[in-house]
Swiss-Prot record:
Compartment(s) of residence: Cytoplasm
GO CC annotation: cytoplasm; ribosome
Protein name: Ribosome maturation factor RimM
NCBIfam families named among the record's database cross-references: 16S_RimM
Pfam families: PRC, RimM
MF-aspect GO terms: ribosome binding
Species of provenance: Marinomonas sp. (strain MWYL1)
Domain of life: Bacteria
Domain notes: The PRC barrel domain binds ribosomal protein uS19.
Gene: rimM
Coarse class of the protein's main subcellular location: cytoplasm
Length: 181
């Protein structure tokens, strides 16, 4: 059986996908990717897995599109019985490996947890997640301590229209949004 390499936790652990199941008999796995495009997960060759006994690392050997999904081969895993041990695990990278973005562009992970405040200074809550809807992305804002009320809000992620300012250092997003809505 292949051994996972013990490793220190990544500086800033970021989930980029999940190993969902075994694929074939030669130790390949099916993947669910959170990256955009989904094949972007293959840009990261060094993956961290959080196991009950701590952080472990694996190295991507090969990856490809297979039908509507992704499959990958991990170094040191050559048969389906070996990879069963890593199925169901999230795939992490160190956020420091992400490419630099242009000014005004953000990774979703940077926005999650920001306090959402109206331009009038009313705290609506914190960004709990973002959703892709087709027309535009949507910010899910959940109430937090000190927020205006206990309501969850869905606010279109439309910079310049509804999202007026993002300050990562202050952990705040200013929005043009009626707290009663």
């Amino acid at each position: 059986m292949s051994e996972l390499k013990q490793a220190a936790a990544p500086e800033q652990a970021l989930v980029v996908g999940r190993i969902t199941s075994v694929y074939g008999v030669k130790g390949w796995v099916k993947l669910y990717s959170h990256t955009e495009p989904m094949q972007g997960i293959f840009d990261y060759k060094h993956w961290w897995l959080k196991t009950p006994s701590g952080w472990k690392t694996v190295e991507l050997s090969q990856g490809r599109l297979q039908g509507r999904g992704l499959v990958a081969s991990v170094k040191g895993y050559t048969d389906r019985d070996q990879v069963k041990d890593i199925c169901g695990m999230d795939v992490y990278i160190d956020a420091a490996e992400l490419p630099e973005l242009e000014e005004g562009d953000y990774y979703w992970s940077q926005l999650e947890g920001l306090r959402v405040i109206t331009k009038e200074g009313v705290l609506l809550g914190k960004v709990s997640q973002l959703m892709e809807t087709g027309a535009n992305d949507v910010i899910v804002v959940r109430a937090c301590e000190g927020s205006f009320d206990r309501e969850e809000r869905l606010i279109p992620y439309a910079p310049g229209t509804y999202v007026l300012n993002i300050d990562l250092e202050q952990q705040e997003m200013v929005v043009d949004w009626d707290p009663e809505f």
